[in-house]
Design a protein with these regions (language model features):
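S-adenosyl-L-methionine-dependent methyltransferase catalytic module, highlighting the catalytic core
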Residues: 27-48, 52-60, 70-72, 80-97, ...
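Conserved SAM-binding loop of SAM-dependent methyltransferases across substrates and taxa
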Residues: 1-11
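Conserved SAM-binding motif I beta-strand of class I
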Residues: 12-18
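Structural alpha-helical scaffold elements that stabilize or flank donor/cofactor-binding regions
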Residues: 7, 63-64
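Conserved SAM/SAH-binding beta-strand->alpha-helix loop
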Residues: 20-22
């Protein structure tokens, strides 16, 4: 018997925060009787809410203490000056229930280019961001999402010199390269080397 999973079966309610009012306008191809995201059927299935807020001016969420299960932020941190990050994360900690899940994806400057993209204000280094995120939360896992191949090769060689083994063996690496090609290999191989990856995905939890 077929079963349709609706968004509301998984997510009871949702609060999204963005600085740009343009996010309230529905994209072409999605039906909205008013042209607004919040009037689209898919968004109503989320029981959602969208707040327009500049977190550098007001880092406080309009959310009750310990009332959310999941805090998700992707490609946001690099667009804010570092002094604004801690107040924002502190308030995320406030609204997250004990045992709640945190997902953070952001560039890792240790694996990136020295010259930042124009819209990146600041990119955190791997250890720097690790220390900030684990001030309040326990780290479940961090993985690289893609990397520069020369950096990966150097990291593998460093592992061999210092540990006597690599997180990827040369044979595994060559098989993956033959199967997926260089571009996809940048994604697969980065998983085990977050400290030198261009971008990292962090999964953390609020202690119970």
């Amino acid at each position: 018997k077929a079963y349709t999973v609706k968004k509301r079966d998984i997510i009871r309610s949702y609060v999204g925060v963005d600085i740009d009012p343009a996010v309230l306008t529905e994209k072409a191809g999605f039906h909205s009787p008013t042209g607004q995201v919040m009037d689209s059927a898919w968004f109503k299935n989320f029981t959602g809410r969208l707040d327009i807020q500049d977190l550098t001016v007001n880092p406080k969420f309009d959310v009750e203490d310990e009332s959310i299960d999941f805090f998700w932020t992707t490609e946001v941190i690099e667009h804010m000056k570092p002094e604004f990050i801690r107040p924002w994360l502190e308030d995320a900690h406030r609204v997250l229930r004990p045992g709640g899940l945190v997902y953070v994806s952001t560039p890792n400057h240790d694996g990136s280019n020295d010259k930042l993209p124009e819209d990146h204000v600041y990119e955190w280094g791997f250890r720097e961001l690790h220390d900030e995120l684990t001030r309040n939360w326990e780290l479940d896992i961090v993985v690289g999402t893609f990397c520069q191949m020369p950096r990966l090769r150097k990291a593998m060689q460093k592992d061999m010199r210092e540990e006597g083994e690599m997180r990827w063996t040369e044979d595994q690496f060559d098989i993956l390269k033959a199967r997926f090609g260089k571009q996809f290999l940048r994604v697969v191989a980065a998983t085990f080397y977050p400290e030198i990856a261009n971008n990292c995905a962090w999964i953390l939890r609020k202690p119970k």
